[in-house]
């Protein structure tokens, strides 16, 4: 059977046009999403499978995107091991019992994500039934470091000083935490694949806060172990593609090839061809338009998107995306026009 365009690109196979999807493609910029959000809290939407499935499908019905991504959040996974999570107005996520010591880490519970985040697993099943063969479905998780950073800081942070302090001062406690989170993330992604996810993405939103040497020592081995675990445990041959996306990591791209991910996501802080050269020819790349570009006039959006496609130079293995999630102020029509443009412009090139 012919692979969907997105899955073919993940495996660096020729496609008739560049596949496109957008991080946070189901979100506040869409009126359909806002209509649901007016009636439900964010975590209620995440934890109600029928709502999460409906929201996941909204972009597929509105735009010619080549993949769906399950509507979920990275942080509820932490609730299962004993952390207390709320979303506060104007503050974002808050962990009310952050991890600040080896004793805090030792007190974490063992848990099975199939039970603790069963609502997301069920949402994946519902979406797969509705999608049928129309488009692949992407599952995802936060990567161990990013989850650890939220758990230690108690929420978002500009400098991650508490996380780094724990990492440096209590290296054994740090390893214990990362091993626990690696086990959780691996099991969660495997459960998503078992439920029908066709590919999975690891979001390492905060890894760019680290020095390269610290990333290599304290983070990379656990990303590698996650990917090994998922491939070995998912029961699918060949295993579904795994995407690794870290924000602010342009200075570490050469190291990211060591993750052994099938696809490396690039943010907007590097030219796509330069980033691809650094991760190497044996890896597909995803990206990398600055999401704020979508606030510009269409002529500017088109020019910048064309530049990215030109830099990809028709090489198999490029998935067009943004360098981060769609921002709430983005015009819906710009998203639609961009998806159409990527297909039309890239189809004029030869993909072989």
UniProtKB/Swiss-Prot annotation:
GO molecular function: uroporphyrinogen decarboxylase activity
One GO cellular component, as annotated: cytosol
Name of the molecule in the record: Uroporphyrinogen decarboxylase
Pathway(s) the chain acts in: Porphyrin-containing compound metabolism; protoporphyrin-IX biosynthesis; coproporphyrinogen-III from 5-aminolevulinate: step 4/4
Disulfide bonds: none
The keyword Lyase is annotated on this UniProt entry: yes
Positions bearing the site annotation: Transition state stabilizer: 73
EC number assigned by the record: 4.1.1.37
Functional description taken from the UniProt entry: Catalyzes the decarboxylation of four acetate groups of uroporphyrinogen-III to yield coproporphyrinogen-III.
Record keywords, A-Z: Cytoplasm, Decarboxylase, Lyase, Porphyrin biosynthesis
Binding site for substrate: 24-28, 73, 150, 205, 324
Subcellular location: Cytoplasm
Top EC category: lyase
Family per record: Belongs to the uroporphyrinogen decarboxylase family.
Catalytic activity: uroporphyrinogen III + 4 H(+) = coproporphyrinogen III + 4 CO2
């Amino acid at each position: 059977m012919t692979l969907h365009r997105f899955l073919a690109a993940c495996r660096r196979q020729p496609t008739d046009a560049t596949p496109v999807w957008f991080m946070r493609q189901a979100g506040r910029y869409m009126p359909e999403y806002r209509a649901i959000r007016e009636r439900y809290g964010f975590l209620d939407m995440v934890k109600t499978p029928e709502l999460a499935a409906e929201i996941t499908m909204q972009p597929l019905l509105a735009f010619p995107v080549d993949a769906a991504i399950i509507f979920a959040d990275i942080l509820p996974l932490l609730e299962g091991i004993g952390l207390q999570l709320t979303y506060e107005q104007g503050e974002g996520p808050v962990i009310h019992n952050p991890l600040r010591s080896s004793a805090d880490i030792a007190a974490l519970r063992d848990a099975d994500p199939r039970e603790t985040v069963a609502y997301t697993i069920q949402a994946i099943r519902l979406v797969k039934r509705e999608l049928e063969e129309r488009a692949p479905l992407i599952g995802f998780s936060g990567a161990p470091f990013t989850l650890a950073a939220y758990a230690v800081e108690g929420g978002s942070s500009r400098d991650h000083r508490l996380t780094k302090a724990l990492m440096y001062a209590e290296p054994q406690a740090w390893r214990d935490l990362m091993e626990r989170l690696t086990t959780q993330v691996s099991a969660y992604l495997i459960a998503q694949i078992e439920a029908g996810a066709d590919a999975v993405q690891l979001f390492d939103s905060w890894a760019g806060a680290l020095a390269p040497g610290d990333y290599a020592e304290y983070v990379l081995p656990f990303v590698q172990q996650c990917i090994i675990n998922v491939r070995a445990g998912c029961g699918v041959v060949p295993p579904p593609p795994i995407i690794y996306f870290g924000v602010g990591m342009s200075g570490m791209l050469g190291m990211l090839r060591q993750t052994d991910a099938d696809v490396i996501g690039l943010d907007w802080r590097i030219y796509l061809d330069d980033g691809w050269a650094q991760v190497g020819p044996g890896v597909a790349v995803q990206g990398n338009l600055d999401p704020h570009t979508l606030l510009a006039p269409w002529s500017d959006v088109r020019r910048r998107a064309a530049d990215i496609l030109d830099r990809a130079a028709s090489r198999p293995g490029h998935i067009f995306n943004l360098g981060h999630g769609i921002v709430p102020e983005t015009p819906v029509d710009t998203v639609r026009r961009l998806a159409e443009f990527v297909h039309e412009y890239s189809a004029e090139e030869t993909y072989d």
